[in-house]
Amino acid sequence: MAFEGLSEKLNNVFKKLKSRGKLTESDVKEAMREVRLALLEADVSYKVVKDFVKSVTERAVGEEVLASLTPAQQVIKIVNEELVSLMGNSNARINMASKPPTVIMMCGLQGSGKTTHAAKLAKLLKKEGHRPLLAACDIYRPAAINQLQVVGGKADVKVFEMGQTDPVVIAKKALAYAKDYGHDILIIDTAGRLHIDEALMDELVNIKKETNPDEIMLVVDAMTGQDAVNVAKAFDDAVGITGVLMSKLDSDTRGGAATGFFRFLRYFWVGNVITHSCYKTPSKTAVAFEVIREKAAVTFSFFP
């Protein structure tokens, strides 16, 4: 599970601090050097780590902290608070249109799990009482339409497809179909690429213009580490993403890349089976508790 390695290393640092009793400024700075290394090894970006350690150090070396009866606990508390601040604001709820259908455009690189996550999201929304429609707008990848039909079938959600027609036309027709047949949510599965290119972005921009999506969800592979942050930035610059769905996060024990776009993070699923996978919504406080288990009075899950 994500953050396991980071959690273990940070807690080792805190155990050392607690064993010393009274702390000096030198003790705190040495601990922060170890924290810095642990964060970098967990795939947190260099700039984020630098700013984080600077903020913690400035607060932790103050006379009030070092002179307290429990200085180590004070330092742990400061690290926890700075972690929560680092995560920023996250809104896990879908922005629903005031007048249906709500349009959700899915985007991402090929192999990120975009099509599967489109079906998982559709199943989740159907379970919540909605009537979603999946639109097959990936006409390039072999068997992409068939894959969406298969996963859509497992989610018990209808799939709108027009074969190898222009994806922009398909998206526009799917929106009209959703309106005509009472689907209150349209999820558009767009084409991915092996890497970001101009043609991919132009197509997404044109689909966005035609459908005016309420949400633009980027699916990123957590296993790609900091590359996931770079991918998120590229898509955000091009089309303005409103949310991120992370795939394979339960396979990565580092998890630090998530800090780069936590404010966008909406859902994370455990397992690949459409009918049995478990979804989670993000909580920045829960992440901080998971990373710093020393401070937690009870056991917290990564995403409660």
Predicted feature residues:
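Primarily NTPase-proximal linker/entry elements flanking Walker-type ATP/GTP-binding cores
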Residues: 6-137, 144-164, 170-180, 184-190
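C-terminal-of-GTPase-core extension/linker across diverse P-loop GTPases
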Residues: 80-93, 181-187, 193-195, 253, ...
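Short, glycine/acidic-enriched loop or turn micro-motifs at the edges of active sites
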Residues: 139-141, 192, 224
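Conserved D-loop-proximal element of ABC-family nucleotide-binding domains
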Residues: 142-145, 196-197
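Conserved catalytic-core segment of NTP-binding enzymes
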Residues: 166-180, 195-283
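Short linear/disordered segments characteristic of secreted peptide precursors
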Residues: 298-299
